[in-house]
Amino acid sequence: MESYKEVWLKAGLIYALNLLSSGNLKPVEIGLGERYFYVDIDSPDILTLDEAKDFAKYNQYDYQLVEDNRGSITVVYNGHQIKLNGGKPNQNVHPKYFQILSISVHHPSPEKQYVRVLGVGFEKEEQLKDYLNWLEKVSEYDHRIIGDRLDLFSFPEEAPPGVVLFHPNGQIIRKEMMRFMEEINDSMGYKEVYTSHVYRSLLWKISGHYDYYKDKMLLFEIDNDEELGIKPMNCPAHILIYKSKVRSYKDLPIRFSEFGHVYRWEKKGELYGLLRVRGFTQDDGHIFLREDQIKDEIKLLMKKTLDVLAIFGFKGDDVRVNLSTRPDESIGTDEQWNKATDALISALNELNIKYEVKEKEGAFYGPKIDFDIRDSLSRWWQLSTIQVDFNLPERFKLEYVDKDGSKKRPVMVHRAIYGSIDRFMAILLEHFRGKLPTWLSPIQVRVLPITDEIEDYGNSLMAKLRENKIRVDMDSGEETLSKRIKKAYDDGVPYLIIVGRKEKDEGKVTVRARGNIEIRGINVEKFVQALVEEIRNKDLNQSAVSKLK
């Protein structure tokens, strides 16, 4: 898949100009990426996927690229101007094989609505074929399909678009993820808090969200005179807790954590399963500290973040670390930015972590470190983030009493290791292709009695497993054993216990694991102990199998 990233896509330009030649379609923006291009069209007509593909023919056009003093590039062709998003194209590269992948509605603003055509292009036909085959493979493991099959979540019509309902099986996965993060937070000295979902708009005006984030906020009035807003972020509420009492330099760092549910009113056309929703839960954390504490805190956060990612199998070359520096528009002094950036760099170097510098891509309120992960389908996802913030402490006039009795402004660090629990769950479902590690699996063991008369033995086995906190159910249906085994596999159950008359008489079990591994005559206690250890260690592979052989 790496070779695809080296192909610069001029296909988007060519495609947009083809659309212009159709007469009634007006491209307004072209986006060019590593593999994909998109064209936003202002059209009074409905464009179907088949019609779009008809326009996707390679032609040569005489166009001009006009760059203004801000670096924005416009494509000019036959008097038409089209905004170019993604940089100046290499006119020596001409992908000849491209495919239109999808058509969707794009909302650049509340007042505008465009048709977005998404495509991909390559210089070689084999590259395109390989890519389309890969895309088909990826679609088989779409988390929405897996979620429906495993009965994890749903998006009912009665709920607004982008609002998910987690079913019992899905909530088990979420709770396991949260329990693990609670352990991590406890090990770092966090104190868990709980904050309200609704606040006066005054809070969001102080924080700046009202000015910069209003379009994505849910705002409403009560008593015809007071405006309230549902939180899009947890940080302002954590700040209110910090401000609730006088803080001393000896108290710092103060670490708050929360599994906070936030709401962001994304455009309907941008919603996508659990990956893009309007309400989601963050494993949020905020640290209030002195400037001289930044480096040590960042080192702790980075080590723990890498430890967490490794538990899920993301390590080595499957993790990328990015350092984003001060953008042109920012707040804070040069001294503060230099001190914070130097602290991040020192922390990275002392931990011997390779990283890429993304110049001027930091937040306006401080530098940040992001962690990208690569899944089993070779896709990269931006996941964990650590952000230094000078802005909110200034806006809220946060203080601590220093050793000399003077009042000082603390620095704030935002961190989220999962990012969004819901989004990370979607990534894991696709990464593991529905076959989650045992510790995350909603059902960890399924008992399959061969005949009805063995059910009592099956019930006693379930009781034994439940005593040891193992999630278990039993399928004693009328279908054949082979069909029940297949159903358990489709349900993502990692271990099956098959019991017949012989197993009951001997007080043993036959254990079947993923990969068609079957071990007969296993002592029940031995199986339980091996499974408990596998779950406790959060093993990715079925380590209990090796202990049973």
UniProtKB/Swiss-Prot annotation:
It catalyses: tRNA(Thr) + L-threonine + ATP = L-threonyl-tRNA(Thr) + AMP + diphosphate + H(+). It is found in: Cytoplasm. GO terms for molecular function: ATP binding; metal ion binding; threonine-tRNA ligase activity; tRNA binding. Its cofactor is Zn(2+). Zn(2+) binds at C235, H286, H414. GO terms for cellular component: cytoplasm. GO terms for biological process: threonyl-tRNA aminoacylation. InterPro entries: aa-tRNA-synt_IIb, aa-tRNA-synth_II, aa-tRNA-synth_II/BPL/LPL, Anticodon-bd, Anticodon-bd_dom_sf, Thr-tRNA-ligase_IIa, Thr/Ala-tRNA-synth_IIc_edit, ThrRS_anticodon. Belongs to the class-II aminoacyl-tRNA synthetase family. This is Threonine--tRNA ligase catalytic subunit.
